[in-house]
Amino acid sequence: MEIYIEQLKNQDAEDLFNFELTNKSFFETMVPSRGSNYYVYEYFQKQLAELLKEQTEGISYFHLIRNTEKEIVGRINLVDVDKEKRIGSLGYRVGEKFTKKGVAASSVKLILAQARVYEINEIHAMTTTNNIASQIVLEKSGFSREKEAETTTVDLNGGNVNFVHYIWRTTKD
């Protein structure tokens, strides 16, 4: 599937809200819930305003993943950016009907290229031990598996899962 990424903007609010609402149950099989308030549009708009403020300040960079029909197929973000150390953390999610089409791998490749523009040289990522697909995407994208977090566990669908930590570092041209 051909995709591109673009920076999140306020005008994306309604489409993004619908994307999140449509994929709520699917996402919650892999990551902890965002809470019921997140799916109330007025609350969502406030959260979006906070994200856009972070983006303006250069603390985080939020992107939508879109297909050639301009439909939102996922999100990919660089957050907790430390400009002095040139470090950030990666997060992404792909909508249920767009999985197994190479969207995650393609969008990670695109965000790593964008990281150079943002002057980020090291990116940390975490995924749960049960999310094998995400582990494969990260490893094939040049991330190194660092360790399984011993103290970072979450309750997911009635069971505890640990996080696996990854790091990507830019190579000098």
Model-predicted segments: where are they?
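Acyl-donor (CoA/ACP) binding surface of acyl/acetyltransferases
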Residues: E2, Q7-D15, F19-F26, F62-D173
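A short helix-loop-beta-strand connector motif used in the catalytic cores of GNAT acetyltransferases and
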Residues: S36-N37, A49-H63
